[in-house]
């Protein structure tokens, strides 16, 4: 399957995607928290019907959210819901209510899957490796502990809170635009080279660009024509730049 983007209602367009052909779904769904025309929550029952049909059994379904939408999202499929990432956006929002409640500088990223998904932890640098021997301990929870310990901290496993600054100062094309670096991080975590990533609410095309940058294939869907055209031009330009370098 080749990469492509399409303008239209995602629930209708997804019907043309073959069964169990998608390796990852990465989407910033409408939260339904604004008066914007496009910010209408997609019916969860119809959404999951298509997600479960097109996604492979080991595909990660990774969806952005914020309260109260994120709670509704988890409850819409508790059987497949596994855990959350927390995206620290660095810059706070909600200044109009700053005297009534704390500024919001994070969003959640909910992870769903049927069976164990591809997981490539993105390691970071740590301290030097240390090996040592320690007397075994008897614990109430785990019983007798092993006596030999190897502390290998040259690389650190990722934690659930990830810090990525927004792209708004570089390129702001959509009100809810997500940083390409964060999308690349998630794509590398849950897919391998040449896997297919679906974004059924692609907005200005950031997920598709992140897929291009990480050597993955993509399918992007957008209902708003003007936003779709922006995404189309942006994706084409990024592809051209990648071919030059």
Show which residues each predicted segment covers.
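Short, conserved SAM-binding/catalytic segment
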Residues: 232-245
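Core catalytic lobe of class I
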Residues: 1-229
């Amino acid at each position: 399957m080749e990469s492509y983007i399409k303008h239209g209602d995602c629930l209708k367009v997804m019907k043309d995607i073959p069964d169990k052909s998608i390796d990852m779904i990465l989407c910033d769904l409408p939260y339904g928290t604004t008066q914007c025309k496009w910010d209408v929550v997609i019916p969860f029952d119809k959404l999951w019907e298509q997600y479960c049909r097109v996604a492979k059994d080991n595909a990660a379904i990774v969806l952005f959210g914020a309260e109260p939408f994120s709670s509704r999202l988890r409850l819409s499929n508790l059987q497949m819901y596994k855990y959350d990432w927390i995206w620290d956006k660095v810059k706070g929002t909600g200044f109009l209510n700053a005297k009534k409640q704390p500024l919001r500088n994070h969003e959640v990223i909910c992870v769903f899957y049927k069976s164990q998904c591809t997981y490539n932890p993105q390691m970071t640098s740590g301290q030097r490796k240390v090996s040592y021997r320690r007397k075994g301990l008897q614990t109430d929870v785990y019983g007798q502990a092993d006596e030999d310990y190897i502390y290998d901290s040259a690389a650190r496993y990722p934690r659930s809170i990830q810090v990525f600054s927004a792209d708004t100062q570089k390129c702001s094309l959509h009100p809810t635009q997500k940083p390409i670096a964060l999308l690349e991080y998630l794509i590398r975590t849950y897919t391998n080279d040449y896997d297919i990533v679906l974004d059924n609410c692609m907005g200005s095309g950031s997920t598709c660009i992140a897929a291009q940058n990480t050597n993955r294939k993509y399918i992007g869907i957008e209902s708003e024509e003007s936003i779709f055209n922006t995404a189309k031009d942006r994706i084409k330009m990024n592809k051209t730049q990648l071919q030059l370098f």
